[in-house]
Amino acid sequence: VGRPTAEDSGKSHAHTRRAVLAGGALLGAGALLGATPAGAAGKVVAERRLDDRLVELTVDSPALGGRSTVALLTPRGWDGRRPGDRWPVLYLLAGGDGDHTTWTTLFKVQELAELRDVLVVMPGMPLFGFWTDWWNHGKGGAPRVRTYFLREVVPLMERDYGAGPNRAAAGESQGGFGALGLAARVAGLFGAAAAFGAPVHPVRHPEMWLSGAKFVGVDGYAIFGDPWKQWKTWLDWDPYHHAAGLRHTPVYLASGDGKPGPLDGDEPDPHIPGTEKWVALADHGVTSVTEAVCGEETRMLGDRLASLGAPVDVHIYPGGHSGTYGYRELRHALPMLMAALRR
């Protein structure tokens, strides 16, 4: 893939603004969420109580063309809620595997005392869904993962489950891409956003994400399209190119540098065919090219936000893409996220 190069990072602000306008980024949260929470397009078809705080919902999702799972970590008083009772909401977006349970099994969010008075919403998504409305080779249609979140998950939470208007978001890997992209493109949606080991500038390394999709059996060209032919689509979804939309949103960015860290095992990441270019360019000692690329993209977005005067905190550390560092990084980001929820 030849067209996406480092030059994309030097595009003018005017070019970025055109891409933002083309993507509808200047619409406010109310417009993109639908007129009212009562207009939620999805339907909860099952509820399952997992423990005294954890509830799992099965959602029939027109946007996804099937069913999805959303887990809730409920706050104090939630079981006895009355109409009109509302809590601040932390949305935690799943990574590329789409597995919402990572937040309770790996990140251990249920152990955080700071979240006892917060409704934590953990939606799943399709494998390698990228929190994106897929291009689908020009046909559109399901999975429309962004639409699922904006027009189904959030309205359902606000209509039936006590979610209030004070929202923050965090995500690991592709979930971080989703949290930042949504925060940048939908004004007023989140008061703060955090991303851990995330592809936050994927147009910089398109072959990495196309190859990663193929590696897990997903047609990567169905997501954003071909980076030559659908270059504008790639730009429209890229958080870096919507950085101006984050100028007034506190952001926490964290990523490993791809070199072994204290929480990594001895084995390198499996080789992903198609990533040879980035393997060859990787620094000596890198064992996770995926995380090294995420680290580079994180630095680039952090620098861009800093140049705009945005409130951003960047943490780059030795480590790979296993997700084991998310436990620590979520706790680093939590004061910023909680400050937004208390406003």
Per-region residue spans from a language model:
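N-terminal secretory signal peptides
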Residues: 1-15, 26-31
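Non-catalytic cap/lid and distal C-terminal segments of serine-dependent acyl enzymes
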Residues: 2-3, 19-28, 39-343
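N-terminal signal peptide c-region/cleavage motif recognized by signal peptidases
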Residues: 35-37
